[in-house]
Amino acid sequence: MPRIAEARAGAEPSSPRQRARRQSILKVAADAAASTGLERVQMQEVAKSAGVAIATLYRYFPSKTHLFTALMADQIEGFAARVPERPAGTSPEDAVFETLGSATRNLLRRPALATAMIQSANAARASTVPDLARIDSGFLDLLLRAWGVQEATDHHITRLRLLILLWYGVLQSRLNERLTPQEADADLRLACHLLLAPGPDAG
């Protein structure tokens, strides 16, 4: 019988050994979801393949929702670290579009894993899954950097939040094959220009 998701946050690793153990769990979980999809990932098998006790896995990740939300947060942080500076001559809204397009292509390399992470993040509650806040803040910081905004106002944050919600919908439609790559790019580009281009209500 599968373990019922617990309404508590996972423990944070406090030593290099614990951090390595946590990363091993995340890598095994990512490979498993990429191969079988979220529903068929078994926590017992993840623990066994990662070489940890099942109690250790549940200490860090009380449920699959915690596990794959953490994985998405790590992936966004890793992606942000690899994004180059905006090329000269690129408009801010085009730079944000390129960043979102690159994130989309990166996630679609392993569509079953992308679906697992999105489903988990959508099911997570912010009060018990702290990594949800890491996803939100990581994505906002990434797009603010691409946009070239150093001192964000509430209006900046609101526009980016709307754009991120739209991006999730476009990504889900790509995963469901409801949009072609060309349609997805066109929708994202239009959204970036409508929401981010300079105008009388900018700032």
Regions found by a protein language model. Give the residues of each.
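Short hydrophobic clusters on alpha-helical segments that form packing/core surfaces
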Residues: 25-33, 75, 103, 167
